[in-house]
């Protein structure tokens, strides 16, 4: 057991040793052969993560910071933290491409060039790295303002703009969509998307898969949250006219939308609140988990009995259709008491899976061994 130590230098860097006792993992249930440990704790509402070529883990925290976590001795626990951006608004999304770190605010997207080079030369006189504005014309409505960022293999940056409401129609077409930033142009990838805060590209087909949070106040069991697949850009996924596979909205369902609605490929359940997702194509986990999608169910907030609060694993056939979905990690919800809220999974280059938790303020590390 390690003892927690902290040292702050110039307010930007913290050295620490993870205290396993700070988070009780005994109640968590995993599939056979898997173990869960703490990669980093004492964080501040961590959400999306991205890994640099040198193994640095970048994290968007909901409190207005983007941090870098460094496991210098490669023991599976972060031992230092550097704040690379602060004083941000709704700072959850992060993505890396070609050595540059991209991160979000509610209405802006920034980047820091050669971020790991800056980290490698960091000292107490470094100050904060220079950030460059990439996108600055997004809506600033706070309702569903959290962003998820993801680059495709060509360097196009994908991000979400959630609906500014529970259910409504807006004159601004950017709302309720997933867009990509391509050569200074904004392209609509998916429309009619109420609030997606998790998407990833299939490792083989490169198709975009995304979750969507269903609307509220239609009862405990309706409508379902969704997992969707984009077959071509510009498809319309129903909001606000239609929810899940078959539920027409009581207010907007009779309107002529002018769109063909695309049904979800998987209904996840009402109010489970899917957030981050990550496809797995590493070598540590069993072979049958190749190209599975891990989906964080953040958990309900307005249901008479709580649901969600777990990480699930979704299997697909060769056509990208869902074959099976099952719990991968559960146990954060017990007797209506919640000990954690899984936020976003991320596969590390070593094949392990990181999982952020913005209630327990930790990042877990999940590993596999046949002897476990």
Where are these regions (language model features)?
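Beta-propeller domain segments
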Residues: 23-30, 146, 163-166, 181, ...
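Blade-level signature of beta-propeller repeat domains, shared across WD40, Kelch, NHL, RCC1
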Residues: 346-371
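A short loop-to-beta-strand structural motif that recurs across blades of beta-propeller domains
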Residues: 65-68, 100, 108-110, 177-179, ...
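Blade-edge beta-strand/turn elements of extracellular beta-propeller
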Residues: 24-41, 74-87, 115-140, 171-198, ...
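Short loop/turn segments immediately following beta-strands, especially the blade-tip
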Residues: 69-75, 112-125, 231-237, 313-321, ...
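Asp-box/WD-like beta-propeller blade repeats and closely related beta-sheet repeat scaffolds
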Residues: 90, 95-97, 107-152, 160-164, ...
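Conserved beta-propeller blade signature
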Residues: 56-60, 100-103, 156-160, 207-211, ...
């Amino acid at each position: 057991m390690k003892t927690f130590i902290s040292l702050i230098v110039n307010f930007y860097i913290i050295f620490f040793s993870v205290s396993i006792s700070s988070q009780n993992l005994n109640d968590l249930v995993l599939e056979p052969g898997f173990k869960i440990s703490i990669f980093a704790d004492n964080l501040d509402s961590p959400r999306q993560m991205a890994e640099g070529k040198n193994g640095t883990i970048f994290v968007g925290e909901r409190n207005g910071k983007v941090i870098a976590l460094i496991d210098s001795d490669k023991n599976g626990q972060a031992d230092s933290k550097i704040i690379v951006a602060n004083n941000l608004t709704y700072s959850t999304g992060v993505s890396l491409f070609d050595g540059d770190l991209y991160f979000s605010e509610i209405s802006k997207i920034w980047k820091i060039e050669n971020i790991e080079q800056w980290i490698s030369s960091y000292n107490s006189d470094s100050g904060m790295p220079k950030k460059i504005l990439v996108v600055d014309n997004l809506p600033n409505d706070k309702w569903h303002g959290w962003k998820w960022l993801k680059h495709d293999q060509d360097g196009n940056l994908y991000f979400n703009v959630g609906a500014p409401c529970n259910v409504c129609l807006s004159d601004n077409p950017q709302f309720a969509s997933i867009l990509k930033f391509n050569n200074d142009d904004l392209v609509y990838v998916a429309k009619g998307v109420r609030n997606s805060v998790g998407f990833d590209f299939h490792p083989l087909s490169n198709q975009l898969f995304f979750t969507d949070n269903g609307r509220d106040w239609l009862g405990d069991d309706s409508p379902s949250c969704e997992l969707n697949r984009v077959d071509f850009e510009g498809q319309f996924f129903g909001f606000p006219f239609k929810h899940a596979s078959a539920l027409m909205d009581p207010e907007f369902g009779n309107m002529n939308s002018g769109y063909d609605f695309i049904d979800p490929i998987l209904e996840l359940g009402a109010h489970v609140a899917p957030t981050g997702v990550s496809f797995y194509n590493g070598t540590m986990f069993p072979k049958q988990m190749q190209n599975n999608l891990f989906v964080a169910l953040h958990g309900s907030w307005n249901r008479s009995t709580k649901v969600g609060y777990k990480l699930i694993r979704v299997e697909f056939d060769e056509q990208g259709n869902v074959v099976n979905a099952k719990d991968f990690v559960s146990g954060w919800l017990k007797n209506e008491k919640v000990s954690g809220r899984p936020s976003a999974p991320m596969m590390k280059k070593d094949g392990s899976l990181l999982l952020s938790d913005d209630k327990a303020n930790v990042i877990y590390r999940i590993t596999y061994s046949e002897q476990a």
